[in-house]
UniProtKB/Swiss-Prot annotation:
Entry's EC annotation: 5.1.1.1
One annotated GO biological process: D-alanine biosynthetic process
Keywords, sorted A to Z: Isomerase, Pyridoxal phosphate
Chain sites annotated for binding substrate: 134, 313
Disulfides per UniProt: none
Protein name (database record): Alanine racemase
Family in the record: Belongs to the alanine racemase family.
Single GO cellular component term: cytosol
Species annotation: Desulforamulus reducens (strain ATCC BAA-1160 / DSM 100696 / MI-1) (Desulfotomaculum reducens)
Active site: 36 (proton acceptor), 265 (proton acceptor)
Entry-linked Pfam families: Ala_racemase_C, Ala_racemase_N
Catalytic activity: L-alanine = D-alanine
Length: 370
């Protein structure tokens, strides 16, 4: 028998989602598939390959190691590193033909100098902080002066410029409109100086759904690529997505227990009446948080079964006394699909769907279908 826990990834769902995004943004804009964090837990390389086959034209990651993994897998398309690059990584980034994000003049100078020393030009995108409060040039006179100086550096090919929205997935759209206005003002001021860019981009998943005016030259789908919506406040009817991940396990043990039996560490749960307890080979080391102790639910034979007692590092227990003929090796859905969506698990945890799928640990095999 194979591993008793696995994440089933439906690649046909990824294809479908990219095609839906393409229909929404039109034929003339580039799609940069965001595959950071191991493709939001789905597997960066398989997801990237399918996304590119389905119509994406570029990839984005957050760490150099993520870009290197994609290159070693034979992917040749442009890859944008969305975050910080340390000076001692710049040479490797150039060797792997990774497009870098520049958000400070001193960083730009360092990249340019290393590129010139290698007889290369480094392709970069400039990041403008229009209201996220993270990395980026400020959209004021000081920031504009820095951007102008960066664009004058030898050794750089300043291909693109971008920003990131903080609240595009919320019901109140005013802050996103304000951010977009600030970004366009920066672009207009730079254009007045004769500085233009091949790729202007700011539309994340929520903006793709809610703000068509922000599409510009390129869009950056992240969570929607995987079939999950950015929040409950976006109009889901605009984009018909298919979730790609279902986390599954097989029951490893079933036993009948009497009323008063204690379950798991700390004896925090006491069985109120005779029942059947099933053990699952799933714990917090696999990305099933301890916070779900006596709170989470799973699907056994299509019925809900409650997690009882504390979630352990490698195991957890569920009460299956109300479900007939539960046996060892029966398949259990931990989350995924319409009957137990990842969003429900996120609600139990007080978090977001992004975090739940990213939590799925590296020792959980990904099994690809479709």
């Amino acid at each position: 028998m194979k591993e008793p826990i696995w994440a089933e990834i439906n690649l046909e769902a990824i294809r479908h989602n990219i095609k839906e995004i393409r229909k929404m943004v039109g034929p003339n804009r580039e799609i940069m598939a965001v595959v950071k964090a191991n493709g939001y837990g789905h597997g960066a390389v398989p997801v990237a390959r399918v996304a590119l086959e389905a119509g994406a034209t570029r990839l984005a990651v957050a760490r150099l190691s993520e870009a290197q993994e994609l290159r070693r897998a034979g992917l040749k398309v442009p890859i944008l590193l969305l975050g910080y690059i340390s000076p001692d990584q710049i040479g490797d980034a150039l060797e792997y033909n990774v497009t870098l994000t520049v958000f400070r003049f001193d960083l730009a100078k360092k990249i340019a100098a290393i590129a010139q020393g290698r007889g290369q030009r480094a392709t970069v995108h400039l990041k403008v902080d229009t209201g996220m409060g993270r990395i980026g040039f400020t959209p004021d006179e000081e920031g504009l002066a820095e951007i102008t100086a960066v664009c004058a550096l030898n050794g750089l090919d300043v291909e693109g410029i971008y920003t990131h929205f903080a609240t595009a997935d919320e019901q109140d759209k005013s802050y996103t409109r304000w951010q977009f206005k600030r970004f366009m003002l920066v672009l207009n001021r730079l254009e007045e100086q004769g500085i233009t860019f091949s790729l202007r981009h700011c539309a994340n998943s929520a903006a793709i759904m809610e703000f068509p005016e922000t599409y510009l030259d390129l869009v950056r789908p992240g969570i929607i690529l995987y079939g999950l919506y950015p929040s409950e406040e976006v109009d889901k009817g605009k984009l018909l997505l298919q979730p790609a991940m279902t986390l599954k396990a097989r029951i490893t043990h079933v036993k009948k227990v009497n009323s008063g039996t204690k379950i798991s560490y700390g004896c925090t749960y006491t069985v109120p009446q005779e029942t059947d307890i099933a053990s699952l080979p799933l714990g917090y080391a696999d990305g099933y948080p301890r916070l779900l102790s006596s709170k989470g639910q799973v699907l056994v034979k299509g019925k809900r079964a409650r997690v009882v007692g504390r979630v352990c590092m490698d195991q957890c227990m569920v009460d299956v006394g109300h479900i007939a003929e539960v046996k060892v090796h029966d398949e259990v859905i931990i989350f995924g699909g319409a009957e137990l969506p990842v969003e429900e698990v996120a609600t139990w945890l007080g978090t977001i769907n992004y975090e739940v799928v990213c939590w799925v640990g590296s020792r959980v095999p990904r099994v690809y279908i479709g």
